[in-house]
């Protein structure tokens, strides 16, 4: 069984301890959609934590658009 934590409406500092971890998340635009988006938590060029989507290289999800996130340990 994989361990994970769930955070609702995360701020970038909530993601800081998990840089490099795999995560699944829901968008604030689609709160009823299951965890359909996934990627790894990284830092952008300004040092802000975000999720780099694994399905699309150019998609970055910043904390302002994440409704809920599961971070796998």
Annotate each PLM feature.
Residues 1-17:
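Mixed-charge, Lys/Arg-rich low-complexity intrinsically disordered regions
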Residues 4, 67-73:
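Mixed-charge, Lys/Arg-enriched low-complexity segments
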Residues 15-66:
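Acidic, low-complexity, intrinsically disordered interaction modules
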């Amino acid at each position: 069984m994989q361990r994970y934590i769930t955070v609702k409406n995360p701020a970038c500092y909530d993601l800081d301890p998990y840089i490099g971890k795999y995560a699944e998340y829901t968008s604030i635009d689609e709160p009823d959609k299951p965890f359909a988006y996934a990627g790894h938590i990284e830092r952008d060029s300004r040092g802000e934590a975000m999720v780099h989507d694994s399905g699309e290289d150019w998609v970055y999800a910043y904390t302002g658009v994440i409704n809920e996130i599961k971070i796998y340990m």
